[in-house]
Amino acid sequence: MLRVAIGLMILAGMTVADSYTDSIRAWQQKRDARLRSQDGWLTLVGLFWLKPGDNTIGSADSNDFVLPKGAPARLGRLRLTHLQLQGDRVTFLKPDGSSQELSYSDEKPDVVRAGSISFFVMKRGDKLAVRVKDSASAVLKNFEGMKYFPVNPELHFEATLIPDPKKIPILNILGQTELEDSPGRVEFSYKGEKYGLRPIYEDDTLYFLFKDPTNKTQTYQAGRMLNTPLPVNGKVDLDFNHSYNPPCTFTPYATCPLPPKENALPFPVEAGEMRYKNGHADYTASLR
């Protein structure tokens, strides 16, 4: 009878472990699907900074903003006008004489499409830029998928939020600094030592930007990212098996935020995504 009981306990433990591993695999599959989507990070092919006045855009080399081949040679003009009370206005002037004012809100910017090419205006700091995507990009076509560390339940923590709400400076790869809201420090214990990370917010999640010794050879040099649900009763479900690479891994046209200095962990976080072998080289060292 004792043997039966022990066997059932072992089986139950294996079932829980298998269920956890399956949940991580499911997250990895969703991540892969997002990366392969027709407007995901792998489709990013251009980033242009608007100057006051007219900015021509199209595939012809004479344009201010040169799009990939396949786009119209003369797609139009983007006119940046500064209005004293309303702020900056961007108008897309088409060759047929029609025009469209382009919203550049973070939530839902206006998107202009021409075949497989699309673009929209975004704001970074006090500057406006045009982000260009191509659903037929070579990076997307040649994507071989991500590699992951083996699932490691030891790097899944019930962490504690130590409230200390304040704005913290976050540097991006352009050298710009934005002040972001942080709720406090999230602390956890690992192998008898206490560690902490300071997250910011992203939509309805906590957003962690962190570095660790694996960045030297195993993971992306500039660090990785991790999202968690918002705290419940002061507790945070912190699972490093959900760690992923920033968009700068795949393209030089992203504007990735960099981990704050206090988010450098001294131990190797061997969980989550590994460095992409065909990834874009890290060019952020001079900013850190």
Predicted feature descriptions by range:
Residues 160-215, 220:
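Flexible, glycine-rich surface segments
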Residues 44, 49-112:
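Forkhead-associated
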Residues 18-48:
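N-terminal pre-domain segments of enzymes
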Residues 96-105, 194-242:
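An exposed acidic His-Trp-rich patch
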Residues 1-7:
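Sec-dependent signal peptide recognition
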Residues 115-178:
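Surface-exposed beta-loop interaction hotspot
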Residues 9-17:
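Hydrophobic h-region of N-terminal signal peptides that target proteins for export
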Residues 146, 215-218, 235-237, 241-288:
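Extended, aromatic/histidine-rich regions of cofactor-dependent oxidoreductases associated
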